[in-house]
């Protein structure tokens, strides 16, 4: 049995959705198919709800576009007849529900998180019903078995309950199943929640792990993990194999081919992930598994980058030798739901720098200044501020630990090209070296690192995705 996930671009047009039909129907074994909303629909749902909440009557025009996309898609891909009429009626009922919600928001001029989560869930519900009809699959409502619980003001997966419900739901598995991705429900209240941006990948991985699937396939609009963004490096090609660790590191540092939480559930069960292109189904794609076939072939597998980085530094002579400073930093940030993707600390212990997304920078400074208010007042720690408009670059490869000189070559290359490194970090596992530069230096950094490694004895794979445009 396999699980296949198709993203928004894969179901975003008539041609692509018909390609999905051919790919799914070619599978002989039992298959569970997970789909995202039609490409662009989630953004339209969010925009329409915000317009309605602001009292902008033109929200109705946005809503009409949402209706048109789905009605026309059905007309194009489902032959005229009773099946099409029945499907239009079913979709029409959901769209009418959505219309009523938007009207309510417009009247009260308010949009709660609960209502917003409900609205965005319609994208996957609508698309999955259409694809189920198109492929002859049996539709299952993921809200009934993907369960979340609230932690630190965010909804996170209740793994134990979800696994139990997935196994119960699919104890007798039909040959072809269709499931909406991304959406879930709170285990206590039953309210609609979601798994976050990229959550459809996660839905597929959760199901694959719970059912011990033979494989998980992620179908998207690229040929897998590429050696370079062709907008930056023209000699890009597909990376055939990555380890779970390498793929996770690349994804955590900006490569949006696969949603990072997707990897752990299947890694735990040793289920391979195959990333394929819906628009080029014959392509090899990228296989992600525990061990690659030739682990000695490359010291560096890829470079990934995050271009919206803020660096926050907690510093002061009063930190030296004081136990628990870092604990307080990370506890305060975690309590407020702020994720840290880079940590750099001076050996003298008088400063700790953390990398966060620009959107989290102001809140991070606020909570840290509050946490260390006493030390700041006494002059032991300096007032905490964020340095914004930065970028983080990470080179990744499990075999760096076996290859001396990688860090020297990396920073030597940057120095010779006049690129200043603001902060850097390397884990003890030696699977990645990450560093922070001014965002204006990002493109140059990627190019010179590529040239230095690719044209040398070390074969380089490069990934740089600066602004994710993936669907749910």
Range-by-range predicted roles:
Residues 360-376, 441-458:
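Charge-rich, low-aromatic oligomerization/scaffolding segments with amphipathic character
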Residues 1-259, 263, 436-438, 457:
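Nucleotide/pyrophosphate-binding catalytic subdomain
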Residues 263-265, 270-273, 277-386:
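A glycine- and small/hydrophobic-rich beta-loop-beta segment
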Residues 375-389, 424, 455-462:
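Conserved short beta-strand edge segments in small beta-sheet-based binding/regulatory domains
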Residues 315-317, 322-345, 395-398, 404-427, ...:
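A structural feature that tracks compact, well-ordered secondary-structure segments
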Residues 349-358, 393, 430-438:
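A generic structural motif
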Residues 463-472:
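Single conserved hydrophobic/aromatic residue that forms the stacking wall/gate
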């Amino acid at each position: 049995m396999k699980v296949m996930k198709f993203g928004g671009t894969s179901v975003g047009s008539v041609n692509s959705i018909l390609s999905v039909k051919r790919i799914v129907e070619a599978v002989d074994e039992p298959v569970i198919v997970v789909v995202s909303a039609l490409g662009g629909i989630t953004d339209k749902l969010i925009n329409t709800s915000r317009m309605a909440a602001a009292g902008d009557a033109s929200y109705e025009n946005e809503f009409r576009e949402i209706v048109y996309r789905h009605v026309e898609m059905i007309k194009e891909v489902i032959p005229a007849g009773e099946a099409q009429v029945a499907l239009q009626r079913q979709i029409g009922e959901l769209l009418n529900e959505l219309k009523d919600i938007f009207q309510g928001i417009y009247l009260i001029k308010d949009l709660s998180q609960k209502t917003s989560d409900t609205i965005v869930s319609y994208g996957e519900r609508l698309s999955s019903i259409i694809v189920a009809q198109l492929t002859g699959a049996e539709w299952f409502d993921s809200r009934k078995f993907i369960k979340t619980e609230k932690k630190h003001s965010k909804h996170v997966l209740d793994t134990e309950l979800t696994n139990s419900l997935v196994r119960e739901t699919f104890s007798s598995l039909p040959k072809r199943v269709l499931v909406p991705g991304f959406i879930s429900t709170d285990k206590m209240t039953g309210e609609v929640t979601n798994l976050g941006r990229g959550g459809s990948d996660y839905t597929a991985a959760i199901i694959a792990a719970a059912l011990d699937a033979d494989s998980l396939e992620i179908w998207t609009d690229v040929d897998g993990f590429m050696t370079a963004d062709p907008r930056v490096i023209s000699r890009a090609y597909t990376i055939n194999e990555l380890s779970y660790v390498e793929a996770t590191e690349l994804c955590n540092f900006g490569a949006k081919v696969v949603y990072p939480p997707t990897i752990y559930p299947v890694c735990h069960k040793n289920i391979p992930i195959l990333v394929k292109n819906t628009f080029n189904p014959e392509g090899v794609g990228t296989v992600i598994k525990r061990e690659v076939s030739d682990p000695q072939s490359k010291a560096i597998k890829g470079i990934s980058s995050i271009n919206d980085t803020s660096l926050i530094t907690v510093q002061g002579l009063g930190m030296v030798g004081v136990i628990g400073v870092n604990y307080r930093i990370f506890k305060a940030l975690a309590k407020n739901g702020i994720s840290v993707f880079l940590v750099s600390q001076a050996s003298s212990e008088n400063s700790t720098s953390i990398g966060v997304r620009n959107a989290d920078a102001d809140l991070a400074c606020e909570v840290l200044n509050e946490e260390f208010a006493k030390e700041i007042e006494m002059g032991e720690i300096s007032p905490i501020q964020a340095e914004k408009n930065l970028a983080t670059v990470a080179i990744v490869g499990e075999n760096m630990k076996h290859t001396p000189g990688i860090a020297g070559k990396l920073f030597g290359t940057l120095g010779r090209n006049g690129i200043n490194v603001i902060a850097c970090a390397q884990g003890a596992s030696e699977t990645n070296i990450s560093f922070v530069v001014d965002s204006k230096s990002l493109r140059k950094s990627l190019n010179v690192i590529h040239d230095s490694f690719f044209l040398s004895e070390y074969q380089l794979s490069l990934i740089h995705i600066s602004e994710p445009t993936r669907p749910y």
